[in-house]
Amino acid sequence: MGPAPRILELFYDVLSPYSWLGFEVLCRYQHLWNIKLQLRPTLIAGIMKDSGNQPPAMVPRKGQYIFKEIPLLKQFFQVPLNIPKDFFGETVKKGSINAMRFLTTVSMEQPEMLEKVSREIWMRVWSRDEDITEYQSILAAAVKAGMSTAQAQHFLEKISTQQVKNKLIENTDAACKYGAFGLPTTVAHVDGKTYMLFGSDRLELLAYLLGEKWMGPVPPTANARL
């Protein structure tokens, strides 16, 4: 019997394109490395407020840089990223609270669907420039991910409950206590120690901490590796 898998907590918000990149890479490696990946829906607005930080898009020069960087990241990570036409306006203004509460509900009620539903919501906002704030938009993403319409509607009815709100706050507070100042934030529990890593470009360092092999953002499949 081999060593127990190391726990990795990924704190993310679908409003963050860099969260999507980190999410996809960790999902690719979860069957290649000896890890147990825990997805934790989080509110980036709460982390920014708690840390006193600003989203990169809100800093003019960083915003200009993002427009140049995203097309390169799309190719490098092989994730279909496209900047929404009005991201700095309506997309940011509307936020992601309904989507993140829905994902929190999924994590509580049907966690095996969390990866797929999270991905479909990212696909809407960060690939197809579609809404993620209206209930029907979230429902469409959940159904596309493979959830039944009835189940998705049931979960939508729960997003305004105090239990779900508290869980999302709990996740956000946990990220802040680890020292998060943005997303994605990955927390690795290795040999009794805890390491907090920020961003989608720290995953090679994560591999080093885990004692695992880094094979780039798009590693071979488990079968190919064997």
UniProtKB/Swiss-Prot annotation:
Domain of life: Eukaryota
Pfam families, per database record: DSBA
Organ and tissue specificity: Predominantly expressed in heart, kidney, liver and skeletal muscle.
Iron found in the keyword field: no
List of residues binding glutathione: S16, P17, Y18, N53, L183, S200, D201
Catalysis performed (reactions): RX + glutathione = an S-substituted glutathione + a halide anion + H(+)
GO molecular function, one term: glutathione transferase activity
Modified positions (N6-acetyllysine) in chain numbering: K68, K74, K85, K93, K116, K158, K165, K167, K177
Gene Ontology, cellular component aspect: mitochondrial inner membrane; mitochondrial matrix; mitochondrion; peroxisome
Transmembrane helix recorded as keyword: no
Keywords for the protein's UniProt record, in alphabetical order: Acetylation, Mitochondrion, Transferase
Enzyme Commission designation: 2.5.1.18
Compartment(s): Mitochondrion
Modification type N6-succinyllysine: residues: K36, K49, K68, K74, K93, K116, K144, K158, K167, K177, K193
PTM annotation: Acetylation of Lys-93 is observed in liver mitochondria from fasted mice but not from fed mice.
Family annotation (SUPFAM superfamilies): Thioredoxin-like
Example of a GO biological process term: glutathione metabolic process
Quaternary assembly: Homodimer.
Function comment: Glutathione S-transferase that catalyzes the conjugation of glutathione to exogenous and endogenous compounds.
Family classification: Belongs to the GST superfamily. Kappa family.
Name of the protein in question: Glutathione S-transferase kappa 1
Protein source organism: Mus musculus
Encoding gene per record: Gstk1
